[in-house]
Structures are given as C-alpha cells and as structure tokens.
C-alpha cells in the first residue's frame, strides 16, 4: 500500500496514467502483468449514461462482490454499505449531487473487484461518512494499492509506504 505526495503539477496524475496505460511513455516501455486488473479512481469521473438508475449503473460492473472476509454481497447490499439505501438506488444517476456521483463511481470501481487499486485524490468531495467507509475497505484490501493525495492524515492511515514526487521527476521516500 503506497501513497504518493507531491506539489501541484509535479506529475502525480501523469504517473498514474502511465501505469494504467492511459498515456504512453515518451521513452522506454511500460509493462503490465497479464493478471493485473486495474481499478482507477480518477479525480473527475465520467458518466456516459446518466439516465441509468444508481443500481443499474453498479450492476454494469457486477451483480455480486465477494468481500475480503469471504462474504458475498449483492450490488444493492454493497450500495447500502456506501450510504445508497432505499429509493436512491432507483434514482437516475443524473439526480445525484457531485459528491454522490463520485461516491457512486468509487462503489462501481470496487464492485469490479480489481487486484490493483489506484486512487487519484480520493478524499476530494467525500464527506466523513464516505471517508470512514473507504478507510475501512482499504484496511482489509488485499490487492496492490497506489494512492495519490494531498491528505496526509488519510495517507498515514491507509498507506504503508509514502513517496514524494518532486517537480523535477525525482522521488524521495519515507515510511
């Protein structure tokens, strides 16, 4: 579980985009293992079809998720864990607030059950409730985790190793 800090415009998001293959390196190559399945939480997620209901949007990723404790949860039950209870699951995505949409994007990402989770500024726009749920999920997450954030408190809680990406491209690390 690795956390990455850096000043604005130091290349943190570019680094994540290189890892996931969103962009190609100017030189060299980037190789991803054949069993690697990325879950990439971006700062500004896109919703191609906001007419879907919250539940339909999540079910596009999976009907069920097997949590780290072996518990099998339906998409609806997993949504409830993230505060999407009752009628809101049948509301169109277009009716959600910005923070709710980001939370929904996170739930869908986690429902896809990636083995390499990449979070780019995950604490932006999340309320305390969502932050607590995310922290609890990350504590028990068994895959690779790479987080970029300016939130040192959050990083100290969920990352094992922290790196600083300098504007000149150098990396310094500390635990």
Where do the PLM segments sit?
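ABC ATP-binding cassette signature C-motif
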Residues: 1-175
